[in-house]
Structure formats: structure tokens, C-alpha cells
Amino acid sequence: METRNVMQKPKISCIYLDLDGVVADFTKRYKELYRMEPKEAEKKKEFNKFFDEFIETNQFETLDLMPGAVEGLEFLRKHLTVPTQILSSTANEERYDAISRQKLIWLNTHNITFTPNFVPGKKHKWKFAKPDTIIIDDTPSVIDDWRKAGGIGILHTDWTTTLGILKMYV
């Protein structure tokens, strides 16, 4: 009798979903307002000045959805029995209240009812990682930290690719 070595899928207890760059289009709005990519503004040492203005004018409340986000959210809502939660950064502790408030308004506007979790910087996301949890995030360092902490990380580039990878786990 032949035995095969079949890899078992881990039972996933929670999927954590980043907002900016995955569901909400931060970069598009930033470019519309400041005529440059956020990374370019960082290189020119102008990011914080613009980011403060971005927050003061409540831009997080009205960001557009990312391409494919509607389909991605639909899949997470209707086709999975795995709970999904939002895990989003507020950049730092000083900006925590303003950004988390704006992001809650954004979630409500888009009828996204997943439990929201906000952390005062992306470097704190790994604290939610467990071997049976998945994070979907567009930041490589977040994915690296998540995996080092024992979780499963999906580096989001687009929703078609992300859903293809996610379906291997759920």
C-alpha cells in the first residue's frame, strides 16, 4: 500500500486585513493632493508635512476603494466561515486618535463591518500573529514580521493574486 505525504491545510482562526493599499487607496489620494508618490515625498523629506495636512483635512474618511476591493470583500464576507478583522496602522501614537477616527468613518461609509483593530505603527502588527492567522498586507516588512512571529502572511499586490493565494489556505 502506497502512502503519500499530503500537506494538511492549517485550520485558520482569523484573517487580518490591512486597509491602506489593500482596501483603501491611500496612494491615489496622496498623489492627487501632492503630485507625488508617498515614497518620493519621503525621499524629499516632505512626507510628514504633507501627511499632517492629509490628516488635518480628514482625507482617510473619503479614500477611494482599491481596484478589486469590492470583489475581495465580497469573497471574505460570503464565501468564508473564517472570521475577518481589520488590522490597520495609525502611523504612530500621536496620530492614533485622529487616524483611527477617520478610518472608522471610512469603514462605516463602505459598510465594512469587520472588527477594526488599530495599532500605533505598522511595527506593532506582528503582535496579532499566531500560527493559525493570516494577514493580507501590502507592506513587505509587515509580512516579514508576521511570518517571523509564526503567522501566515500574504503580500498583497492585487486582489486576483491575493484571492488565489488565500484560497490555498481556506
Where do the protein language model's features map onto the residues?
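Short amphipathic alpha-helix with an adjacent loop that forms part of the alpha/beta core around
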Residues: 126-129, 165-170
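Acidic, Mg2+-coordinating phosphoryl-transfer loop and its flanking beta/alpha structural elements
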Residues: 134-166
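Substrate-recognition element of Asp-dependent hydrolases with the DxDx(T/V) motif
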Residues: 61-64, 69-100, 107
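Class I S-adenosyl-L-methionine
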Residues: 74-77, 104, 108, 144-147, ...
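Short phosphate-binding/catalytic loops that engage adenosine nucleotides
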Residues: 81-82, 112, 151
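Substrate-recognition "cap/lid" segment bordering the active-site pocket of phosphatases
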Residues: 88-133, 140-143
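Active-site neighborhood of HAD-like aspartate-dependent phosphohydrolases
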Residues: 2-57, 148, 158
